[in-house]
């Protein structure tokens, strides 16, 4: 027979477990409510899978640098409409072959794919309160909650018009013992303040998806995000460099950013531990 002290311990444990279940239920309810309605065709779902490293046809060295845009896809395995935003992003990528990189930012603690606390910090930074949402080139004014390739491309084109030429960006990386060491170098073509970001993503992640399937294949899943200090008062022609370490593994990918005044100026891609040089327009 349990003593009074033991009964108290058991009762305390039961209360703790009940509170834990209640907290999980509340988080799940918040997640469900946050998943906004869409006007998409319910059958308009993406082909599951990741995004291969896109290599442009390299132009002559010394010309304008090849320009890419970035889309942050704020998503969740719990969100019934989130696969529709993924489909919209893939359609936008198809219309701008090799020009758009995507990072899937899984959010909320109920999502086992969420990188915490980074995903929550990113959602707060861009004012994300509904899912799915997308942000182009880290520009808060580009936040959308409608799964539309046309809207995504309109923001991408608007921001590209503001940078007719973009900085060149190259990556030199190595991977050992689960640690990625990446050296980023950029040659800027406009005056301004610049910064780097190193992002690690993973493709082919199998996890249940509401609105998808129990064995849904997720791509571009955010695994690490590192930001450099700001390089102030840069002049056109300056070369900037930054070396950083992050956790990574074989098969993951690097999405590197060079940002001007906080907005993406250019994007470079390569496998984790790999390297890629400056790329040029044809």
Predicted regions and their residues:
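N-terminal secretory signal peptides that target proteins for export/translocation
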Residues: 1-19
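Bacterial Sec-dependent N-terminal signal peptides
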Residues: 15, 19-69, 282
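Sequence contexts marking disulfide-bonded cysteines in secreted/extracellular proteins
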Residues: 36, 80-83, 271
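Secreted/processed peptides and extracellular or luminal domains of membrane proteins
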Residues: 41, 85-88, 276
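Membrane engagement elements in two modes
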Residues: 45-48, 54, 84, 91, ...
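Local sequence-structure signature of Cys/Sec-based thiol-disulfide redox active-site neighborhoods
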Residues: 60-100, 105
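Short, conserved sequence motifs used for protein processing/export or organelle targeting and
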Residues: 104-282
């Amino acid at each position: 027979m349990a003593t009074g002290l033991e009964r108290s311990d058991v009762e305390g444990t039961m209360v703790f477990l009940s509170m834990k279940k209640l907290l999980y239920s509340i988080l799940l309810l918040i997640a469900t409510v946050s998943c906004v309605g869409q006007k998409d065709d319910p059958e308009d779902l993406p082909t599951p899978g990741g995004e291969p490293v896109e290599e442009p046809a390299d132009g002559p060295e010394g010309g304008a640098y090849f320009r890419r845009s970035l889309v942050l896809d704020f998503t969740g395995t719990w969100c019934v409409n989130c696969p529709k935003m993924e489909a919209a992003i893939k359609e936008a990528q198809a219309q701008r072959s090799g020009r758009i990189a995507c990072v899937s930012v899984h959010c909320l603690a109920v999502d086992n794919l969420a990188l915490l606390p980074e995903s929550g910090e990113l959602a707060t930074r861009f004012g994300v309160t509904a899912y799915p949402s997308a942000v182009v080139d880290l520009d808060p004014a580009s936040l959308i909650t409608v799964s539309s390739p046309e809207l995504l491309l309109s923001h991408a084109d608007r921001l590209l018009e503001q940078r007719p030429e973009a900085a060149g960006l190259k990556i030199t990386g190595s991977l050992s013992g689960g640690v990625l060491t990446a050296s980023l170098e950029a040659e800027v073509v406009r005056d301004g303040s610049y910064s780097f970001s190193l992002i690690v993503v993973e493709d082919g992640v199998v996890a249940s998806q509401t609105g998808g399937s129990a064995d849904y294949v997720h791509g571009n899943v955010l695994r690490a995000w590192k930001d450099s200090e700001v390089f102030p008062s840069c002049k056109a022609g300056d070369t900037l460099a930054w070396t950083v370490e992050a956790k990574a593994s074989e098969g993951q990918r690097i999405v590197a950013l060079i940002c001007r005044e906080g907005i993406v100026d250019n994007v470079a891609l390569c496998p984790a531990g790999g390297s890629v040089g400056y790329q040029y327009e044809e």
